[in-house]
Amino acid sequence: MAILERAEEANIGEGSGSSEWELGVRQLCDSGITTLPARYVLPPADRPARYVTPPALLPVVDLAALRARDPCQLAALHAACRDYGFFQLLNHGVPPDAMLYAARRFFFDLPLPARKRYMSADIRAAVRYGTSFNQLNDAVLSWRDFLKLLIRDTRRLADVLPSWPDAPDDLRPAAAAYATACQRLFRELMEAALDALGIVRCRRQLLEECDAGSQMMMVNCFPACPEPELTLGMPPHSDYGLLTILLQDEVRGLEVSYGDGGGWAVVEPLPGAVVVNVGDHLEILSNGLYRSVLHRVRVNGRRARVSVASLHSLAAERVIGPAAELVDEQRGRPRRYMDTDMAAFLAYLASAEGNHKSFLHSRRINTISSSGLTQPSN
């Protein structure tokens, strides 16, 4: 399709109510498209390059050994969070099959009217079926549909469960079991991370707040794309919150930023493992010792990909900043981040800033070097 034709196509439906793209990528695929609609075509500089690097071999952490207080595994966890911001976790106890099966059925088998019941552009909605990444502000849309399930207080899962989709029949129980398993896993990993960081004074309070924190499950669907080299399933971003636990199927797609040259390495799915990554809040809490790393999703021309991300945060009203034990001006460890909360994040999402830099970047404090010049804190 010529560029002019794509541009004309992008304007169809503007100002006339619901456009076809607003119904999601799955609906576009069902309509039989053979070329990528203009709304999804990235500028040449932003398009994913052909694979030129081998799959990323993320650090592997064994939770069974971590539970046994193996100092080598605690050191491995610390190094992974510090150097990579990502790791693969084995022996985690999270039952993956039922959740992925239910997710596939939800996205691929249900007719549009059943899915459309939960469709919304409201980023604050607790249950939301949506498309793209931040569809109100995205200049170019992402090749992704998703189901968002938000639990504002993880102690009250039973209260929110009735609002979750009741079709297919096995989605709600599978999602509830998966959410509970991820909550337990998050608690264990946070205990280990606080130990590795040497956070003692506020450890108990933080863990209690983790138990009463929020959990957002994002069930992602990336259908097979007619021109995958022109678009992305998700643009480069970091995750809000403390930790994200990602369950993915066997189809490659997750890519992690590495080095200073803007390179991307695809993550090879490890059978039986979940992927865990550091979120913005944990980088802030650690005062920059741990890294919340940019990542993105590329799409496949032949196969659909499904993933389930469980993002864990403290309560929405909780203000978080660097742990006092990790800030010491006299020893060269200045405070590197402003305090933040969910309100600041939602305001950021609603602004135009989200199109060109990460939320974490907006919370960093510039420091004064010995030469008197202002420098970024990391």
Swiss-Prot record:
Q: What molecular function does GO assign, one term?
A: metal ion binding
**Principal place where this protein is found?**
cytoplasm
Locate the residues binding Fe cation.
Answer: H237, D239, H295
Listed cofactors? Fe(2+); L-ascorbate
Task: Spell out the subcellular localization from the entry.
Answer: Cytoplasm; Nucleus
Q: Tell me which residues bind 2-oxoglutarate.
A: R305, S307
Q: Which UniProt keywords apply?
A: Cytoplasm, Developmental protein, Dioxygenase, Iron, Metal-binding, Nucleus, Oxidoreductase
Q: What else is known?
A: Plants overexpressing SLC1 are infertile and exhibit defects in shoot development characterized by slender and crinkly leaves.
Functionally, this protein is described as follows: Involved in the regulation of shoot development and salicylic acid (SA) homeostasis.
Listed name of the protein: Probable 2-oxoglutarate-dependent dioxygenase SLC2
